[in-house]
Amino acid sequence: MSLLIKYLSLCWFRNNPADFHPSHAFMWKTVIFYLISGFIVEGLIADPADGILEVSLRAIMAFASIGTLLLFVKRWECYNQLFTAIFICENFIMTLATITEGLYFWMVMTHKENAEEISIAIGFLLVGWYIAIVSYILRQLLVSQMSHSVILAFSYFILTYGIPMLFMDI
């Protein structure tokens, strides 16, 4: 539990993921939670079968993107730390996204004005926060400049969300 709390503190830009050494069981639980929470969120947005396919594609793209980056910068030994840090923080953001969808449903059912605008604004806030978190993790673990880590985080977001979404639209 203490390791989870340390990883979650990365969402508030504290700690360094290089200091954490997750066990294989912890990493697998992180991946399973990532998949289940993704299936729930995508299942609420779209057809459940499409959601499962899209989340599976996102996971594949995430693992491949992290691996490619670490091979490129010759830091393969950081793979477990990097993917665990990103996935834990992404799980946190995904949990907040699920709560946002519940809030949106409640606002629609109670006929609240601007329900759609509010949920879209929260969505943009969560995406911005997610990119900032990934940028922080990359900067801490790979000791890169702020501008490089922001570009890498944005690229990671496009690769893990944009490409699977594009594939699903084809």
What function would you assign to each model-found segment?
Residues 16-22, 73-83, 139-148:
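Membrane-interface helix-boundary motifs at transmembrane edges
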Residues 49-108, 121:
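Alpha-helical transmembrane segments with an aromatic anchor "belt"
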Residues 161-170:
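Juxtamembrane boundary at the C-terminal end of a transmembrane helix
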